[in-house]
Amino acid sequence: MRKALNIPLEEFLRPFFGPGERICLRIFDDRKTGTFKGAKLETSLSGLPGLMDTLKKHNEKNRGIYFVVNFGGHEDSEITRINAQFMECDELPLDEQLKQIEAFPLEPSLIVKTRKSLHTYWLMRMC
């Protein structure tokens, strides 16, 4: 059984991004109930503390906050470095998701439990 950690956002993102690197964040109306069309934000590890109030306000409005896992920008065409392979499956119950993750031959680097799914990451090292 994996140990659950409650870690600061900066610590979670550190394996993906170096100091001073641009981190791209996307904010969506997860429940699709309002007129909010979404937002794209950019910061760095050192800039995260200054962005926390903004992120909390979005979260209080039931908006999902996601980071672009790979480095380079918000769009696929802007990605210049693969930081991790990742997957999620909202359609399966959490226990079934965990069974499939545990059956996979490569142990994940990180698993994040969200409201509906397990976000699973395999960190990459560029050679």
Predicted regions mapped to residue ranges:
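DNA replication initiation on ssDNA origins
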Residues: M1-N83
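Histidine-centered divalent-metal-coordination microenvironment in nucleic-acid enzymes
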Residues: M87, P108-C127
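Short amphipathic alpha-helix segments
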Residues: D90-L106
